Amino acid sequence: HLEPLSAADVQARMPAGHLWKGLSIKLEAEFIIREKIAPALKAAGSSLQNVVKCQVYLRDVEDFAPFNEVWAKHFPRQKPAVTLIPTATPGFFLEDARIEINTIALTDAGRTRKEIIDAGVATAFAGHSQAVRAGDLLFISGMLAADAGGLVKSARIDPAQPYFGSSVQAQMEAMLESAQKICRAAGTSLANVVRIQQYHTDLADFFPAYQVWERHLPAQHL
C-alpha cells in the first residue's frame, strides 16, 4: 500500500507565463505516476502492472476527463480498480496541487495474481475496470448510479411528485445491485464485504443510504 502521493516538482507545473504547454492536471498526473508511484513500486518489488486498486483525489471535476487520458496511457491493459473522488479547493497540503493518488499493489514475485472481473455492469467512467480480484480480496471500482443516459431512471425524482420517493435510496439500490453482480462474478457476495467507503454530496443522505444497506445485509456490522 502506497501512501497518498502529490506532485511537488517543476516538471509537474505549467511554466510561468505559458498557456500552451499542456494541462496542469496532465502534467501532475504524469509526474506522480512516472516519478513517484512507479519508482516506489519498483523499490517494493512491484510494478504498475500489478497495481490492483487506486484512489484518485481531484480538486476539480473538470480534471476527470484529462486525468483519464493519462491513466489510460499508463494502464492500457489489466487496469486496476479505481475510484475518482472530488475534493475541496484547495484540497491538499500543497495549495496549488490538483491531484493525489494512493495505491495498493501486489508484488511481482508473489503467488497472488491479479484478475480483472467483468460482470457486465456500467462503470463510473468509460474504460475503467469494474473490479480486480487478488487472491481472497476483491477490489471494486468506485460506483455511481449512472448509465449511458446519466442518472439511472429509477433514481430520477418526478418533478410533479418531488416528495414521493428517495433518490439516494434508489441510487444505493442500483449500486448495490451492480456490486452484487460483480461479487457473484468473482465468486463471492456482498455478505463478505469488509470495507465500505461512501462519498455523499449531502450528509443528510447518509441514513437513508444506510437503510438500504440494512435491507441487503440485515443485522450485519458494516
Task: Mark where each language-model region is.
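N-terminal presequence-like segments and the immediate start of the first folded domain
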Residues: 1-53, 58-195, 200-222
